[in-house]
A protein has these predicted regions:
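Juxtamembrane intracellular "pre-TM" segments in multi-pass secondary transporters
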Residues: 1-4, 180-212, 398
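Helix-loop boundary and gating motifs at the non-cytosolic
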Residues: 3-51, 207-247
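Residue-level signature of mid-helix packing/kink "hotspots" within the transmembrane helices
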Residues: 51-59, 142-143, 251-259, 345-346
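Helix-to-loop junctions at the C-terminal end of transmembrane segments
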Residues: 57-69, 258-270
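Cytoplasmic membrane-interface "Motif A"-like loop-to-helix N-cap segments
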Residues: 67-78, 266-280
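C-terminal ends and interior cores of transmembrane alpha-helices
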Residues: 79-92, 281-294
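Symmetry-related core transmembrane helices of the 12-TM Major Facilitator Superfamily/SLC fold
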Residues: 160-177, 365-381
Length: 398
């Protein structure tokens, strides 16, 4: 891919950033529940606070990008995160762990929107390819970080914190020396906070809201994997390194299966709605398989099915939002989509933790499957009230 050097720097930085965070995030629930001896409900609350801090970070990052540019915004986010992860090396007991996770959420939240905004400005002629490159880099980081994290955690969780801090230090150096001369062209960028949502009576916005209800429910289900399901695998005596391998498979499949996916959406699921319906169905099948799984192979099969569903749903929603957005409101619509995803990440661990704590995993699986079925319904009807038929294309090759 003939990308400019500045975009390659952003891609490499994002990959290292996500690799560092992926050392820790799939294991957060296990660490809080097994090592800090807290309930799954408490673990869910902690993850919810981390996600809430990320929401604030995203909004702050958007404002900062407009005010001071991408370089300073990213650097500030990295510094906040780096201070937190270095402190985590020395202090990772209760309740300090909560405060540091909140700081990590805030810092990383600032980094992501600024990175995406920079990617669009350094290679405007690349169109979606610039964002796809960042997306693939994230998944390479997830695969590498989750795999290595499980191996390191099986030796000692303390080494997880050290590795995390080391990778963020490398990310800081790349950003400090590599991003300084990247022209952010910030005058052409807008922040979600500057977008006035004067869309109350818009049929298109109503369609987006209905669509995002299903998207939120999908995320509520998805985040059970790094929260309640991770703890569930421990109760079944599945080793940590095997659980972490599930996320390696997830990231590797997303990266390697893009050519197959592009052919599938070209010849089978030709519209975005079809892709989402099939994706939701695969999510349901994945949770059915996981509900019966007692060995690693069962969870591996469930993860493969889940990942294929994710590859269909995740790119489709922002693409539909872009198609629905009136001119000049693209930022607001995309911000709404991102907020919905974060909302699912906030609600999911807490809801799942409470159900697993007070009832059992079987009931949790039933509830998640029911929510996903409702998500199919909202996806089917989201555009019914639009005055004109909106022609939806397929997800671009990634």
């Amino acid at each position: 891919m003939n990308m400019p050097r500045s975009l390659w720097l952003l891609v490499i930085g994002m990959m290292i950033n996500v690799t560092g965070s992926s050392f820790l995030w799939p294991l957060n629930t296990i660490y809080i529940h097994e090592h800090l001896d807290k309930s799954l409900t408490v673990a869910g609350i902690v993850l919810m606070l981390n996600a809430a801090a990320s929401v604030i970070g995203n909004l702050v990052g958007g404002v900062l990008f407009d005010k001071i540019g991408g370089f300073k915004s990213i650097l500030l986010g990295i510094v906040i995160t780096l201070v937190a992860v270095i402190t985590l090396v020395f202090f990772h007991g209760w309740p300090v762990y909560i405060y540091l996770l909140i700081l990590i959420g805030l810092g990383s939240g600032i980094v992501f929107p600024a990175t995406y905004a920079l990617a669009g400005t350094v290679w405007p002629e690349g169109g979606r390819k610039a964002f796809n490159a960042i997306y693939v880099a994230q998944n390479v980081g997830v695969a590498a970080g989750a795999s290595l994290g499980g191996l390191v955690a099986s030796i000692s969780f303390h080494y997880i914190f050290i590795a995390n801090a080391g990778l963020y230090a490398v990310f800081f150096l790349i950003a400090y020396f590599g991003y300084r001369n990247i022209d952010a062209k910030r005058a052409s960028q807008t922040s979600i906070l500057d977008q006035k949502p004067a869309v109350k009576n818009s049929q298109k916005f109503t369609a987006l809201v209905i669509l995002c209800i299903g998207y939120l429910l999908c995320w509520v289900g998805y985040v059970q994997w790094p929260s309640t399901i991770s703890s569930h695998t421990q109760s079944l005596n599945i080793p940590l390194n095997q659980y972490s391998l599930l996320w390696t498979v997830n990231g590797a499949l997303i990266v390697c299966a893009q050519p197959i996916l592009s052919q599938f959406v070209k010849y089978v699921a030709k519209t975005l709605k079809q892709q989402m319906i099939i994706g939701f169905f695969l999510f349901i099948v994945s949770f059915v398989v996981a509900s019966y799984a007692e060995q690693f192979t069962g969870f591996l099969l469930a993860m493969v099915i889940l990942t294929i569903g994710e590859m269909l749903v995740w790119p489709a929603v922002p693409t539909i939002a872009d198609d629905l957005a009136p001119k000049g409101r693209q930022g607001f619509y995309q911000g709404f989509v991102n907020s919905t995803a974060t909302g699912g990440r906030m609600i999911g661990p807490l809801l799942g933790g409470m159900i697993a704590d007070y009832y059992n995993m079987n009931l949790l699986f039933i509830i998640i499957i029911s929510l996903l079925i409702f998500g199919i319904f909202t996806t089917l009807i989201y555009d019914k009230r639009l005055k004109a038929t909106i022609e939806l294309g397929t997800v671009p090759n990634q």
